[in-house]
Amino acid sequence: MPTHRNWPTWASLSCNPSLAAAALIGLIILVSATIYFSTATVLPRIDHTDMKQVDLGRRLYASSCASCHGASLEGQPNWQRRLATGRLPAPPHDSSGHTWHHPDSILFGITKLGPAAYPEGHQTDMPAFGKSLSDAEIAAVLAYIKSNWPVEIQRRQSSLNEKR
């Protein structure tokens, strides 16, 4: 049975580049797996047919989202044209926008994390709601938004979730 005396030393690693590379790769995999599994979030249930969840989402949307995305989910005018700041206006969440082009995991991440959910360098005025809304409340807002889409849009967006 090996003991700690059989483990490679730093000196032996420096003399054997293959062993050093293997040790480094192993360390990177271990650290990456630890970070991934300790921060992975289980997506809460987002059910646009659950009227209790939808009603909560409607109230939360009105108080947290409507000021930018519109009381009727219509978004800001000219939402596809950049502002002088280089940022895009808030998009609509009705069927005329692109919200339904994304799976629930992306929508949830953007709502919870705000700018941190976007690729590096992307600028947005979308705030992070992870500190002001619980995961269940974010899910309720998304359920409310989805409940306003036509059935065909709901079906198409749902198929994006199945592909993940």
Describe the residue ranges of each PLM region.
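Extracytoplasmic electron-transfer domains, predominantly the class I c-type cytochrome c fold
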Residues: 82-147
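Electrostatic cytochrome c docking/interface patches
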Residues: 36-60, 155-157
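C-terminal capping alpha-helices of c-type cytochrome domains
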Residues: 22, 26-36, 105, 127-159
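Short, solvent-exposed mixed-charge patches
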Residues: 163-164
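Periplasmic/extracellular electron-transfer cofactor-ligation site
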Residues: 52, 58-89, 112-122, 147-155
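N-terminal intrinsically disordered, acidic low-complexity segments at the extreme N-terminus
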Residues: 1-2
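Short N-terminal helix-initiation segments at or just after the protein's N-terminus
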Residues: 28-43, 71-74, 90
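N-terminal Sec-pathway targeting helices
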Residues: 6-25
